Amino acid sequence: MNGVATTAALNLARHLQGAGITNAEVLAVVAKTPRELFLDAALGHKAYENTALPIGQGQTISQPYIVARMTELLLESRPKRVLEIGTGSGYQAAILAQLVDELCTVERIKSLQIQARQRLKRLDLHNVSFKYGDGWQGWANKGPFDAIMVTAAASSVPQALLQQLADGGVLVIPVGEETQQLMRVVRMGDQFHSQTIEMVKFVPLVNGELA
């Protein structure tokens, strides 16, 4: 990052800390990750604003606060192998890849997946596996996972994702249609314990259809 971007990223991390993000590792990674790399050049001047922005194909790059909050929730269990549903721009994947040993990420829109792969390569992040597929189905032959993060809102919690959680694993997922809640689900044997975190607004998690 150039000096201006570095300062802007540090200021964003400070803003997120003021907004309630407490995990120092998450804040440090936000402060050194060039968010402008994940946006069209025309939106680059907005890269370090705490707002969601369009990335094409009807999708968005999530608000930095939500990226940090979901990452913080996921890291509470100290996961090593993580599944991300909805690669999108690749920004959330870039944050996660710097904090976990192995990241697997699934995207249903081929053009977005190609761009995200190129961006993570530019950042020299090589602990990421990419799949073009239906996020509702997860990535069964790569599981089980210590944690799963879903970056689009599901109408209900996908059963396939619950089954791909390791015992003690954590699923962080927005659930709902018009009204959405961020949920944290923990697997304990065959039992699943869910906790509502806060109200959120995400694009929908599309079931089955690839683009």
UniProtKB/Swiss-Prot annotation:
Domain of life: Bacteria
EC number(s) recorded for this UniProt protein: 2.1.1.77
Coiled-coil region: none
SUPFAM superfamilies in the record: S-adenosyl-L-methionine-dependent methyltransferases
Pfam families the record matches: PCMT
Active-site annotation: S62
Principal location: cytoplasm
Catalysed conversion reaction: [protein]-L-isoaspartate + S-adenosyl-L-methionine = [protein]-L-isoaspartate alpha-methyl ester + S-adenosyl-L-homocysteine
Location within or outside the cell: Cytoplasm
Gene Ontology terms, MF aspect: protein-L-isoaspartate (D-aspartate) O-methyltransferase activity
PROSITE patterns from the UniProt entry: PCMT (PS01279)
GO cellular-component term (any): cytoplasm
Any one GO BP annotation for this protein: methylation
Keywords for this protein: Cytoplasm, Methyltransferase, S-adenosyl-L-methionine, Transferase
PANTHER family in the cross-refs: PROTEIN-L-ISOASPARTATE O-METHYLTRANSFERASE, PROTEIN-L-ISOASPARTATE(D-ASPARTATE) O-METHYLTRANSFERASE
Family: Belongs to the methyltransferase superfamily. L-isoaspartyl/D-aspartyl protein methyltransferase family.
Function: Catalyzes the methyl esterification of L-isoaspartyl residues in peptides and proteins that result from spontaneous decomposition of normal L-aspartyl and L-asparaginyl residues. It plays a role in the repair and/or degradation of damaged proteins.
Protein name: Protein-L-isoaspartate O-methyltransferase
Species name: Shewanella loihica (strain ATCC BAA-1088 / PV-4)
Lineage: Bacteria, Pseudomonadati, Pseudomonadota, Gammaproteobacteria, Alteromonadales
Gene from which the chain derives: pcm
